[in-house]
Amino acid sequence: MGQTVTTPLSLTLDHWKDVERTAHNQSVEIRKRRWVTLCSAEWPTFNVGWPRDGTFNPDIITQVKIKVFSSGPHGHPDQVPYIVTWEALAADPPPWVKPFVHPKPPPLLLPPSAPSLPPEPPFPTPPQSSLYPALTSPLNTKPRPQVLPDSGGPLIDLLTEDPPPYRDPGPSSSDGNGGSGEVAPTEGAPDSSPMVSRLRGRREPPVADSTTSQAFPLRQGGNGQFQYWPFSSSDLYNWKNNNPSFSEDPAKLTALIESVLLTHQPTWDDCQQLLGTLLTGEEKQRVLLEARKAVRGEDGRPTQLPNDINDAFPLERPDWDYNTQRGRNHLVHYRQLLLAGLQNAGRSPTNLAKVKGITQGPNESPSAFLERLKEAYRRYTPYDPEDPGQETNVAMSFIWQSAPDIGRKLERLEDLKSKTLGDLVREAEKIFNKRETPEEREERIRRETEEKEERRRAEDEQREKERDRRRHREMSKLLATVISGQRQDRQGGERRRPQLDHDQCAYCKEKGHWARDCPKKPRGPRGPRPQASLLTLDD
């Protein structure tokens, strides 16, 4: 109890510093999270036997590498650094990898004696496309030991096996019929030529899911010597027609050229051929200019010394011998500068309006939108969206340029300033996944419309009732006022003329005199009655 199972994947994660060092030696950069995702989720889907826990089996790694380097839509150029690092760990294993590395089978120098090869028939029939006539010898001819495989049999793979040795020149056999001398051209001459090997390889059935070249420009053989194989015209044609131009999508074409530089290890002439095929004349001049700007001096800073620039990145064919370590170092440095020139020349002038124009589509997932947004940052700005210092700017662009419903909910998140870009993407994914379907949206709109109509009818009825009640109250008040006035008029009319005696004063109500003779009534001239002042239009 308490024991844990060690797998190749967990082993690489425990020694991640060594893995990064191996990747740096291959001139590539890798990330731990992407490493785990490819090993446990992506490569097992290639159906080549890759386990989810990883493996150091070179055969399985080669199959995955073929899938990754496939040209066209089936390739995965973004996975090149990771499979190259896996291959480097298996080819040159550190001490902690050696217990997990599968032992290499011994090289087969005598293919006829291998159990996988069929026995040679007594009267072999020549292949249909053979370049040499098939010569048969009599049955009583002494059998001659063969070093190279039969021309009709399977060939040794130039990628996975060491090249077969050439046949030592020696005296001809002492057979009287001279049959061996007749057979020698058939057995030795065709196999000793790389071109014949290529022509014979074309007669073999094609390997499934392999659309990239299997003959790399520089390939080290078993004797330590490098073999040179130039690019084939079909590879150059496929690379040019299955990828956008450098002006349309510089990032994609740069990734393709980077994978070619890492895996094929081209020479100076091959690099010029590759650039001349994939780039226009103006684009090539821009790339070369940016590459020469990237040359650094002894102090590690970009230099302006013409001699240092020409030594590191010459414009004319240099005398670099790839069979020497010094020549290979020059080629590695040249390819690194060329890659830097491609990256710098692919950067467009800063145009933040282009970045702000990237908005999330109606049915686009937040992850896909974030990738398009990062690509716009790489293409139209000098900023790296993967830089931690630019995470805040990318996060704000992600919020403001998301779909309206997602952006509003992201803006209302609590403690928004402390949220990382990954947190925002996860929240956006939750909101995106909870979106209603078109049918649900139509049903919701119909239900809301019905509820709105019902509320409007109820409000109209309520207003009508309130208006009727108010009118009824006003009429009631008016009737009450009229009735009370009539009552007052009747009562007032009766009290208006009180009964007086014949000798009673109407003014002081005393008897003995009348009102005109009342001593209490004031005497004097009557003044004019005050007249009400009226306003005229002039006032």
From Swiss-Prot:
Q: Which SMART domains match?
A: ZnF_C2HC
- What are the record's GO terms for cellular component? host cell plasma membrane; host multivesicular body; membrane; viral nucleocapsid
Q: Where is this region: Interaction with host UBE2I?
A: 431-436
Which residue stretches are annotated zinc finger (CCHC-type)? Answer: 503-520
Supply the Pfam families for this chain.
Answer: Gag_MA, Gag_p12, Gag_p30, zf-CCHC
**Changes after translation:** RNA-binding phosphoprotein p12 is phosphorylated on serine residues.
Annotated site, Cleavage, chain positions: Y132, P133, F216, P217, L479, A480
Residues modified as Phosphoserine are S193
Matching InterPro entries, A to Z? G_retro_matrix, G_retro_matrix_sf, Gag_p12, Gag_P30, Retrov_capsid_N, Retroviral_Gag-Pol_poly, Retrovr_matrix, Znf_CCHC
Tell me which stretches of the chain form a coiled coil.
439-479
Query: Which GO terms of type biological process are on file?
Result: viral budding via host ESCRT complex
Biased-composition ranges, Pro residues, are 111-127
Give the residue ranges for region: Disordered: 111-222, 435-539
N-myristoyl glycine lipid sites: G2
Motif interval(s): LYPX(n)L motif: 131-135
Question: Annotated Gene Ontology MF terms?
Answer: RNA binding; structural constituent of virion; zinc ion binding
Where does the motif PPXY motif lie? Answer: 163-166
Which keywords, in A-to-Z order, does the entry hold?
Capsid protein, Coiled coil, Host cell membrane, Host cytoplasm, Host endosome, Host membrane, Host-virus interaction, Lipoprotein, Membrane, Metal-binding, Myristate, Phosphoprotein, RNA-binding, Ubl conjugation, Viral budding, Viral budding via the host ESCRT complexes, Viral matrix protein, Viral nucleoprotein, Viral release from host cell, Virion, Zinc, Zinc-finger
Where is motif PTAP/PSAP motif found? 112-115
Q: Where is this region: Interaction with host PIAS4?
A: 346-394
* Source species, domain of life: Viruses
Q: Where is the composition biased (Basic and acidic residues)?
A: 435-467, 487-520
> Know the name of this protein?
Gag polyprotein
